[in-house]
Amino acid sequence: MKKKIFIGSSSEELRIAEKVKKILEQDNEFEVTIWNDNSIWDNSVFKLNHNFLTDLLNSSLSSDFGILIGTCDDKVIVRGTERLQPRDNVLFELGFFIGKLGLDNCAFLIDKNIHILSDVQGITLARANMGDPDELKRAVNCIKEHFKHQPNSGINFFPSSTLASVYHENFIKPTCQTIIEDNGILDTAGKKHTNCLVKIIIPNKINIDVNSQFQILKNKISTNTLSFNYKGRPRNISIEIVESSEENTTIIDFPTIISGIYYAISNLLPQDSETDSITYRNILARELDRFVNTLYKFIKRDGYDEIVKIVYEDKLY
């Protein structure tokens, strides 16, 4: 899946935004959307029948990175001196996207002659003479390289990251600790299961009833229920297993916690949002992708990637 970049600018400078988009999409690594792009209205984030803030929220949930373009739109008096600064709405959008995507995933592309408020210093800044094609290309390429080097599954402020963290700490980590430290799993019936592999099953898409989704998948697999003492936890846990042989045991888990993604998004967006719309489904798909990427990061960080595999449902059979 291509990383998505949102470009915001004043309506007077859409011409520059289009040039920036063209540079960003040259190597086909990013999918770029310009706000209020009149030349490609169908691909625009903002629609006439939507509230501005609602659409801005939708775009932040649908994007991985944000670039705001600051040009010499307004004249202001700063301590008795006349200076040029970007429009207030551009600064608002910059703050909004930093709050949603994180500081490292946003950039401010500004004209050389612009006055920058001290409050925005410290974010990724790229200055250029907007009328010089070579300067503009160099500045945009600097931003592009910065985005390319951002961790693919970095922890962010989205609900999926929190859910992945909770799932890892409460299921994957203690299960793997038990397998590693005890050289397998000793169930409550006294049977030892060695050479264990944990498979985390991920649905291709999220529906409102995730439990039913997973039950349908579970019905297609012949499994047994096994209980064992959680490592470091004063309680038992029941898991589904598939024993391919006497020596090998595959542990199957369906992370129903991802139902929280659906409810989190439905609570973030206005109540009148169309849950069957392409935008809504795309947001859910990207959140599921973020859940998987974040979970994989935790698994690899703790050294469990040899015994834990993440499998999508269409690769299960």
Curated annotation (Swiss-Prot):
3',3'-c-di-GMP binds at F171, P234, D253. Residues 160-316 are annotated as: STING domain. Keywords: Antiviral defense, Hydrolase, Nucleotide-binding. It is an enzyme of class 3 (hydrolase). It catalyses: NAD(+) + H2O = ADP-D-ribose + nicotinamide + H(+). Disulfide bonds: none annotated. Forms homodimers; in the presence of c-di-GMP forms filaments with an ordered array of parallel-stacked subunits. Effector protein of a CBASS antiviral system with NAD(+) hydrolase activity. CBASS (cyclic oligonucleotide-based antiphage signaling system) provides immunity against bacteriophage. The CD-NTase protein synthesizes cyclic nucleotides in response to infection; these serve as specific second messenger signals. The signals activate a diverse range of effectors, leading to bacterial cell death and thus abortive phage infection. A type I-D(GG) CBASS system. In the C-terminal section; belongs to the bacterial STING family. The N-terminal TIR domain mediates NAD(+) hydrolase (NADase) activity. The cyclic nucleotide binds in the C-terminal bacterial STING region. Upon binding to c-di-GMP the STING region closes around the ligand, which is bound by residues from 2 adjacent subunits. STING-STING interactions are the main drivers of filamentation; rearrangements in the STING domain allow reorganization of packing of the TIR domains, forming the NADase active site; cross-filament contacts strengthen the assembly. This is CD-NTase-associated protein 12. It comes from Aggregatibacter actinomycetemcomitans. The lineage of its organism: Bacteria, Pseudomonadati, Pseudomonadota, Gammaproteobacteria, Pasteurellales.
